[in-house]
Design a protein with these regions (language model features):
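HotDog/MaoC-like acyl-thioester-processing domains
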Residues: 1-10, 85-134
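Hot-dog-fold acyl-thioester-processing enzymes
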Residues: 1-73
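Sparse recognition of residues in long alpha-helices and their boundaries
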Residues: 40, 76, 104-105
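Charge-rich, low-complexity amphipathic helices
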Residues: 46, 50, 82-90
Length: 134
């Protein structure tokens, strides 16, 4: 696998809503009313129910894992939840290689990662460190 600074990794995209949120909640036992009920979301000051922040973090993991395949592994992932995702939004996860350090048996790759909505507004910017096998 060839990796260079500036490489953009293939985008991971999902349309958000109750179906995705319910599956995520079932796996993580996260049935929080603000994520499942529009009235609860409105009571919290939002337009309605909204997606879990950790689901966006999972989308970031997906985009990097899809890019790495069996050629490497994620060793660190961090992000900040700056905006919510709402029902019907198209959320895409992106990544760009920021640095590559050659080591004896592998490459240590630093990526800038982020989720954004269909209008290009960043929802969860972050960073990721991955090891890429030679």
């Amino acid at each position: 696998m060839t990796v260079a600074v500036g490489d953009e990794i293939p985008v991971f995209t999902r349309t958000t809503g109750f179906a995705n949120w319910n599956r995520y909640a079932a796996v993580n036992d996260e049935f929080v009313p603000i994520h499942m009920d529009d009235d609860a979301g409105r009571a919290a000051g939002m337009a309605g129910a909204f997606g879990m922040g950790n689901l966006q973090w999972a989308y970031l993991h997906n985009v990097v894992r899809d890019w790495l395949g069996d050629r490497g592994r994620i060793v660190r992932m961090e992000c900040q939840f700056r905006a919510v995702n709402t029902k019907g939004q198209i959320v895409s996860a992106h990544g760009r290689v920021e640095s590559v350090r050659e080591r004896a048996d592998d490459l240590l790759v630093e990526l800038r990662v982020w989720t954004e909505d269909q209008d290009g507004n960043q929802l969860a910017p972050g960073t990721c460190t991955a090891v890429v096998n030679r």
